[in-house]
Amino acid sequence: MPENKKMNGLKYFYTRLGKPAQHIMTSPIPTAIVGAYMDTKNSAKRIEGFIRRNHIDLTDYIESKYRCFNDFFTRQVKPGARPIDPAPDVLISPCDGHLSAYKISGDSEFAIKDSYYTVDDLVGGDAIADEYMNGTCLVLRLAVDNYHRYCYIDDGFKSRNYHIKGRYHSVQPIVVHRHPVFKQNTREYCLLQTKNFGTVTQIEVGACMVGKIKNHNEAGVIHRGREKGMFLFGGSTIVLLFKQGVLDIPEELFEATLKGEEATIKYGAAICKKA
């Protein structure tokens, strides 16, 4: 389907007339059905067309015969294709994606266009908002042509994973800018006690037709650049919350975000330095 038709369809879902269809399509049932199908051998026949429609470059990926579509979707890169920035005082990107940066207010609030959030909204009401007053929120949106595995941003220790049940709205900007997706969608989060960046909250957000957020480990020691997990079928999002004074983010990144611009970044690449 042409991209403009997809965008028009998404716009319609978020109108008054489209609301009944939106309610059905963002419920867990369609996503569970599609996710189950993408684990079947029959789904492998969809791989070739998906590559062609989305102009996916497979140069960086290990050649493989995929058993099902999800095997393809979570395909691994070749050794060295996603180098980890070696400087320990550099914040690395946990994933391929499109980066936006937001300043968290003294009330632990921030806005993404017309959608307003508190820190507690993102983690299902847990009272951690005070820790992130005047801090920074980084949002990394993964598209369908990105590498769908993600890594730890630093050495340290992680908490257990907390799962929050929710809906499955699209994470396309046209939806995120109009609808409070990140406090309604299914998501998982954990607290990272990091060596260089203090306590960081990392949130993986499910999206329309994402079958599963698959994190590998529960509580324990973590290592910078080591794989943390993966998203199965569909694009999705990672949100990182940092305390005040931790990051030295160029003001230009915040300004670009306010203009609706995203920075393209790769897994393991430098985002900024610590303050």
Give, region by region, the residue ranges found by the protein language model.
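Contiguous, well-folded functional domains in the mature portion of proteins
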Residues: 1-275
